[in-house]
Amino acid sequence: MADETMSVDDLDLPEKARRFFAEQWGIERLHPPQKQSIEPIFTGKSALIAIPTASGKSLIAYMGILRKLLLEDVGSKAVYIVPLKALATEKYEELTQLGKALNLTIGLGIGDATSEAKKINQCDILVCTSEKLDSLIRNRSETMSNVSIIVADEFHLLNDASRGPTLEINLTKLRYLKPNAQIIALSATVGNCNELAKWLDAELIISDWRPVALEYSTYHDLHLEPRLVQSSARSSEPGNLKPPRDLVGPKSHPTWVALEDTLDSQGQLLIFVGTRKSAESEALKLSKRVQKKLSKENPEKLDLFSNVVASIEGGRQSAMADKLIECLKGGTAFHHAGLTHNQRKIIEEAFKSGIISCLTATPTLAAGVNLPARRVLVRDIKRWDDGMSRPLPVMEIRQMLGRAGRPKYDDFGEAWVLCKGTDGW
């Protein structure tokens, strides 16, 4: 049956690896789509895995890499391609934990630092952006001579006008240079999955299974209208929807009303906005309102934020750090590609631990960086592009909404879309 789980102990992996997943990462069973994906991958087939956000795609790739490097083709090399530097760093850190336990070296290729060069040549697993990989293939093709397995994360971006061409050229070149290399493509569900799988000569694994049920709602003039429930097994009938409700607060600031409602239910809110500037200004406005609310209702909580503020103050000072500090005084923060690595790590840890109650972010965060919240609000469904305000692609909105619901912590996630004026709702 496609919906069965599988014990990690039953996997054809070295015992050390199985023990690491169970003891260090607390993973004892595979979700149904993971089990479904592992079967072709462990027989050496290429695969396109198209399953929802936060369903554990990366784990499938890690297991495929370990089987290839430790059992099938010992001494060979893996390449893990990602679209963003922030995502490359996250995957590098996760794989480094694995590498230490299993005696594998991990390299990171995201820029031109001379310190990267040696590790890129000598590593067993190279995590890199498409742009860096393009440079390596052009200038140091010998780096690819021993590659036996290639992972393309966020593979649906092949359809993206700005990032797609580089990824397509890289994969075409790698398939020419290494025709026998196994390819694992990790994708959100897109309309042309069958075509993409055929192009890769890969088996297609497609599923809408989620580890946490998800309720999609529209949010307009403070009126919340649940539209669809996607359960952890399948989409349920509309009869399972919660009744509509009206939130109370200033109509001029619907994001604050959503956050106050979240705070009152001891939750966390992730707000997606269109630009870095919007992320910063929204976080600052919300911080001031949170400070005002907590100073009346729970002043002790304000003290919790001081440790995070101190961590940012202890780093290199900049205008960005000053803005972050102002936001953190009220337990909010912003997250975008303009943050330093250290600032990003501090913010992510504070959000994961529950200290920060609200994070504003650009869609970059939806592309793989693992920061789920019980409630997600997509504030901006349009983007200024080529001199016009254009609607975001449906897939991009789905990626953002898919960050709602924390596996292991929440029974369900709440995915809200803010509708302004006549946004067609």
Describe the function of each predicted region:
Residues A2-A50:
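Conserved pre-motif I regulatory segment
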Residues E39-A47, K57-D73, E94-T96, T172-R175:
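Walker A/P-loop NTP-binding motif
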Residues L66-K91, L177-N180:
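Conserved SF1/SF2 helicase motif Ia
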Residues Y80, T96-G107, R276-C358, R390-I397:
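Conserved C-terminal RecA-like helicase domain
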Residues T89, T96-R138, W209-V212, Y216-Y219:
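Inter-Walker segment of RecA-like/P-loop motor cores
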Residues L126, S130-D134, N139-I183:
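SF2 helicase catalytic motif II
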Residues T172, Q182-K285, A333, A337, ...:
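Conserved interdomain linker/interface between the two RecA-like ATPase lobes of SF2 helicase motors
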Residues A181, L371, R375-W425:
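Conserved segment of the helicase C-terminal RecA-like domain
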